[in-house]
A protein has these predicted regions:
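Amphipathic, Lys/Arg-enriched alpha-helical "gate/interface" segment within cytosolic domains
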Residues: 1-122
């Protein structure tokens, strides 16, 4: 996982690399992401989650979505190349309903985040 904050903006980009084979590994990745968010100075954030590398592993994407620790700081979650199984696995995340955005490229994700920034509650 490669987390990177946008300079002076409440936007965290996270690129998932490699394979996810079990719940513990998935939870470890998402916990690190949530810990970065919780320790930030921002009340609410936009997360750009690049799942391109998991395209070959829909079960890994589902494990990742199903093991996302709860945080109320994620205002919008923009996912790049999310497999269909990931979309199904995020359905129980009621606190993110209408805040999940699916895009096909980094440029689309950047545009979406820039469009959402003025609406962010901070």
């Amino acid at each position: 996982m490669e987390p990177k904050w946008w300079p002076n903006q409440p936007v965290l980009e996270v690129k998932i690399e490699g394979n996810i084979t079990d719940r513990e590994q998935a939870f470890g990745i998402t916990k690190q992401m949530v810990d970065d968010i919780e320790s930030s100075k921002y009340s609410h954030v936009i997360v750009i989650l690049d799942l391109t590398a998991l395209g070959q592993s829909p079960s890994g994407a589902a494990l990742l979505a199903g093991n996302l620790p709860q945080t109320y700081k994620i205002e919008h979650l923009v996912m790049i190349n999310a497999p269909g199984l990931f979309k199904v696995a995020t359905m129980p995340l009621f606190h993110l309903r209408n805040k999940l955005h699916y895009v096909g490229s980094q440029s689309e994700a950047n545009k979406k985040a820039n469009d959402l920034l003025p609406k962010l509650r901070n």
